[in-house]
C-alpha cells in the first residue's frame, strides 16, 4: 500500500510513533483516564512537528569590537575581493608572475639610478673641493675644522645651512597681505618675547615682510646711552663670556679656546688696488685733522698692533681697496679725535666680551665707544647656530662661522668689533660699507674688480693684459671661495684719522633674527667689566669702567 504521507519524512513519522508508544505506556500506580490518553498524544505531535534549527555557537564578546569604526571599502577593493565565477587559474598565475617581474625590474632600475647618482655626486664634490683648494692655496688644518662630540652634531654639521639661510632670507622678503601683517608680528612677539612698545613704528601693518620687522628700529628713549661709561653694550643680548685674553687664546667655554689670530686674521696685505673718489675735505676739517695729528702724533695702525704675516695661515685674502661709503662729518671727527687724543700710559692687556642676540632682541648693533675703524675683513665660512648649546659643544664655532671683523683703534690702543653670522642670519649689514655682501654664492662686482689673492709670488694683474678673451673671462661672475677673507680699508673716510670715526652709541649695522657680537680690545690693567655671565643687557648699558 503506498504511503500517503508523502510530504512527511519517514524518520519524523517513525520518531512520532515511537514517542506515542512510549507515552501510551502507563507507569505503575498511575490511574487510567481517557482524558490523559487523548491530550498527551496531541501535545507530543504538536511539539515534534516543529523543525528544530541547529544552534549557532555564540562567539566570545570582544570589548573593543564596537569601539573602532571599520574603514569603508571602495568599490575597487570590493570588486577585487569578490571571487569571479569563472576560475581561470592559468591567467591569474600569469598576472602574478608579470606583476612580480615588473616590481623587480623597477627596484633594480631604481637602485641602479640612485647608486649612479650618488657616485656622480661624490665625484663632482671631490673635483669641486680640489678646485677650491687649488684656487685658495689652502692647506687643511686639523685645528680649524668641525669637531663634533656626537653623531647628532656630526649630522648637523653636514646640513646645507647656508642654502637654508638663503631660502629663509627669500621667505622673509615675501610681502605679506596687510590684513595678515599685524597678527603675524604679534604672534612672533608673543613667541620670542618682543616688546612692541619699544618699536619706533607703532603701526605694525607698515612692515611689509618679516625681514623688515626683524630689522626694526626702536625709540631712542628706550635705549639711553651711558655717556660717562668707558664702554657700553653694543647691542641687546645675553652675556656668554668675558675676560682677559691670555697667550693669544679666547675662552669659548671652560676648557675650550680659540685663537685671536684665527678670529681676526693675521696676514699683512699690500696697498689697495684702487680707491673710491670722494669730494675734497673742507679746509677747516683738513686743518683740524692736521693739528690733531701734529699735537697727538697718532701712529696706531692695524699691522703694527696685531702683527704681520704669521706662520700658519688659514684663509686666503682678497684685497677690495677702499670701501668707505661716505665721508665723515667735521663734528663727528672732532668728537672722536678729541677722545682718542687722551692716550693712556698705563700697562695694557687684551680683553674680550661675547654677547648673544636672541631672536626676540633688537637686531641692530651700535658703537660701544669712541673709536676709528680702519680695516674690514669679511671671512667667508659656515653658518652654524650660535645658540649657547652649540657654543658649548662645537669647538672653534666663531672661527668656522661667517663673520665681519671691523678693526681699528681707540684711545687705549687696539679695538675691534666682530659681528658673527649664524643659521638664518646670513646677511650682515654695515651702514658705511657699500660693497659688503655676506652669505652670497657669487662675488659682487667690486670683489671681482678689486680682489686678488695675496701671496709671496708675483701674480698677473688683469689691467696688465689686453687680450679680449682674458677680459671676457675676468668679467664673468666668480663664486665666493670658502675659507677666504675679503679685505677693504676705510682710509678715504678721513685723511687724518685714516678710517671711519665712530662715536659712542652710533648705529653701525645689524643682522637678521639673532646672532653674536664679539668685542676684542686693548685697555689698561685697571679696566674692569661690570658684567656677569648670562646677564641680560640693553644697548647703551655700561659694561666696563676704569678703576
From Swiss-Prot:
Organism name: Komagataella phaffii (strain GS115 / ATCC 20864)
Regions of this protein lying in the Mitochondrial matrix compartment: 28-110
Xref: InterPro entries: PS_Dcarbxylase (IPR003817), PSD-B (IPR033177), PSD_type1_euk (IPR033661)
Described purpose of this protein according to its UniProt entry: Catalyzes the formation of phosphatidylethanolamine (PtdEtn) from phosphatidylserine (PtdSer). Plays a central role in phospholipid metabolism and in the interorganelle trafficking of phosphatidylserine.
Protein name, per record: Phosphatidylserine decarboxylase proenzyme 1, mitochondrial
E.C. number(s) listed in UniProt: 4.1.1.65
Cofactor: pyruvate
Residue intervals on the Mitochondrial intermembrane side: 130-547
Deletion consequences: Results in an almost complete loss of mitochondrial phosphatidylserine decarboxylase activity.
HAMAP family reported for this sequence: PS_decarb_PSD_B_type1_euk (MF_03208)
Family of this protein: Belongs to the phosphatidylserine decarboxylase family. PSD-B subfamily. Eukaryotic type I sub-subfamily.
Residues annotated with Pyruvic acid (Ser) modification: 515
Cofactor binding, per record: Binds 1 pyruvoyl group covalently per subunit.
Post-translational modification comment from the UniProt entry: Is synthesized initially as an inactive proenzyme. Formation of the active enzyme involves a self-maturation process in which the active site pyruvoyl group is generated from an internal serine residue via an autocatalytic post-translational modification. Two non-identical subunits are generated from the proenzyme in this reaction, and the pyruvate is formed at the N-terminus of the alpha chain, which is derived from the carboxyl end of the proenzyme.
High-level lineage: Eukaryota, Fungi, Dikarya, Ascomycota, Saccharomycotina
Stretch forming the transit peptide: 1-27
Assembly description: Heterodimer of a large membrane-associated beta subunit and a small pyruvoyl-containing alpha subunit.
GO MF entries: phosphatidylserine decarboxylase activity
GO cellular component: endoplasmic reticulum membrane; lipid droplet; mitochondrial inner membrane
Gene Ontology process terms (BP): lipid droplet formation; mitochondrial electron transport, ubiquinol to cytochrome c; phosphatidylcholine biosynthetic process; phosphatidylethanolamine biosynthetic process; positive regulation of mitochondrial fusion; positive regulation of protein processing; protein autoprocessing
Site residues (Cleavage (non-hydrolytic)), renumbered to this chain: 514-515
Amino acid at each position: 500500500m503506498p504511503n500517503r504521507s508523502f510530504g512527511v519524512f519517514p524518520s519524523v513519522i517513525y520518531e512520532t510513533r515511537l514517542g506515542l508508544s512510549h507515552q501510551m505506556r502507563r507507569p505503575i500506580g498511575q490511574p487510567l483516564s481517557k482524558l490523559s490518553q487523548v491530550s498527551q498524544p496531541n501535545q507530543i505531535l504538536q511539539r515534534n512537528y516543529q523543525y528544530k534549527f541547529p544552534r549557532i555557537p555564540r562567539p566570545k564578546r570582544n570589548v573593543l569590537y564596537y569601539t573602532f569604526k571599520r574603514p569603508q571599502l571602495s568599490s575597487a577593493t570590493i570588486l577585487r575581493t569578490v571571487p569571479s565565477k569563472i576560475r581561470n587559474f592559468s591567467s591569474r598565475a600569469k598576472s602574478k608572475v608579470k606583476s612580480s617581474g615588473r616590481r623587480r625590474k623597477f627596484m633594480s632600475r631604481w637602485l641602479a639610478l640612485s647608486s649612479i647618482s650618488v657616485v656622480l655626486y661624490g665625484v663632482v664634490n671631490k673635483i669641486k673641493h680640489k678646485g677650491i683648494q687649488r684656487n685658495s692655496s689652502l692647506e687643511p688644518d686639523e685645528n680649524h675644522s668641525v669637531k663634533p662630540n656626537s653623531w647628532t652634531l656630526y649630522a648637523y654639521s653636514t646640513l646645507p645651512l647656508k642654502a637654508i639661510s638663503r631660502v629663509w632670507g627669500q621667505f622673509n622678503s615675501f610681502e605679506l597681505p596687510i590684513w595678515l601683517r599685524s597678527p603675524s608680528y604679534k604672534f612672533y612677539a608673543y613667541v620670542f618675547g618682543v616688546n612692541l612698545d619699544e618699536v619706533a613704528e607703532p603701526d605694525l601693518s607698515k612692515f611689509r615682510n618679516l625681514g623688515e620687522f626683524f630689522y626694526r628700529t626702536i625709540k631712542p628713549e628706550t635705549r639711553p646711552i651711558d655717556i660717562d661709561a668707558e664702554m657700553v653694550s653694543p647691542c641687546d643680548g645675553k652675556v656668554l663670556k668675558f675676560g682677559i685674553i691670555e697667550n693669544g687664546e679666547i675662552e669659548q667655554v671652560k676648557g675650550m679656546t680659540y685663537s685671536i689670530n684665527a678670529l681676526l686674521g693675521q696676514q699683512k696685505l699690500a696697498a689697495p688696488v684702487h680707491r673710491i673718489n670722494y669730494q675734497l675735505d673742507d679746509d677747516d676739517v683738513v686743518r683740524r685733522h692736521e693739528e690733531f695729528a701734529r699735537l697727538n702724533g697718532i701712529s696706531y695702525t692695524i699691522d703694527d698692533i696685531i702683527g704681520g704675516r704669521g706662520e700658519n695661515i688659514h684663509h686666503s685674502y682678497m684685497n677690495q681697496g677702499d670701501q668707505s661709503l661716505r665721508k665723515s662729518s667735521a663734528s663727528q671727527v672732532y668728537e672722536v679725535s678729541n677722545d682718542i687724543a687722551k692716550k693712556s700710559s698705563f700697562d695694557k692687556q687684551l680683553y674680550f666680551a661675547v654677547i648673544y642676540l636672541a631672536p626676540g632682541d633688537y637686531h641692530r648693533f651700535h658703537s660701544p665707544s669712541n673709536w676709528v675703524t680702519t680695516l674690514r675683513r669679511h671671512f667667508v665660512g659656515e653658518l652654524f647656530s650660535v645658540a649657547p648649546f652649540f657654543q658649548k659643544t662645537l669647538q672653534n664655532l666663531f672661527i668656522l662661522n661667517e663673520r665681519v671683523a671691523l678693526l681699528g683703534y681707540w684711545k687705549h690702543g687696539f679695538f675691534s668689533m666682530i659681528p658673527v653670522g649664524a643659521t638664518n642670519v646670513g646677511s650682515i649689514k654695515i651702514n658705511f660699507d657699500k660693497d659688503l655682501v655676506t652669505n652670497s654664492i657669487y662675488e659682487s662686482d667690486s670683489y671681482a674688480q678689486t680682489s686678488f689673492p695675496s701671496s709671496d709670488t708675483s701674480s698677473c694683474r688683469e689691467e696688465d693684459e689686453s687680450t679680449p678673451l682674458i677680459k671676457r673671462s675676468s668679467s664673468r661672475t666668480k663664486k665666493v671661495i670658502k675659507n677666504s677673507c675679503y679685505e677693504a680699508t676705510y682710509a678715504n673716510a678721513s685723511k687724518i684719522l685714516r678710517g671711519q670715526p665712530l662715536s659712542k652709541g652710533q648705529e653701525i649695522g645689524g643682522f637678521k633674527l639673532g646672532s653674536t657680537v664679539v668685542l676684542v680690545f686693548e685697555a689698561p690693567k685697571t679696566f674692569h667689566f661690570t658684567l656677569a655671565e648670562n646677564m641680560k643687557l640693553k644697548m647703551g648699558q655700561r659694561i666696563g669702567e676704569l678703576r
